[in-house]
Amino acid sequence: MINDIETLRRALKRGDYCGIVLYEGPSRIDGAPIVAIACRITEASGNAKTGAMVQTFIMRQDIAPHEALKTGDDSSVCGDCPLRPIHKGATRCYVRVYQAPLSVWNAYNRGRYAIPGVDFDAALLPKLFEGLSFRIGSYGDPAAIP
């Protein structure tokens, strides 16, 4: 277990981990299993609009995001958003779930995200994120997590 902030930052920069798991548990929307993940902690995003921001993804633990979108199980993380494709004729969400969200979900399922209390001391989180800007909900509604 990593117990100091510099070692954790080095592990993230080296690519030992792709990011940090912020939450694993039931959705506050419907109780289904979800995960919240923070990425791009030590490096800038390639997204010119967001730049150097920590990206957060809130998604189902048990169903790939593109599959959840097809079946309507995305409601666990998107609630009753009018941009969900289940609403026929509505403007569709701009998030391409088969791109970044699917990549994050696949990496999560391969164990590529550090888990507080397992891989590193959870007390390091405030120091790790100190001074960083966040894009809350790059995919998923933050209301789904406590």
Pin down the residues of each PLM region:
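Class I S-adenosyl-L-methionine
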Residues: 1-146
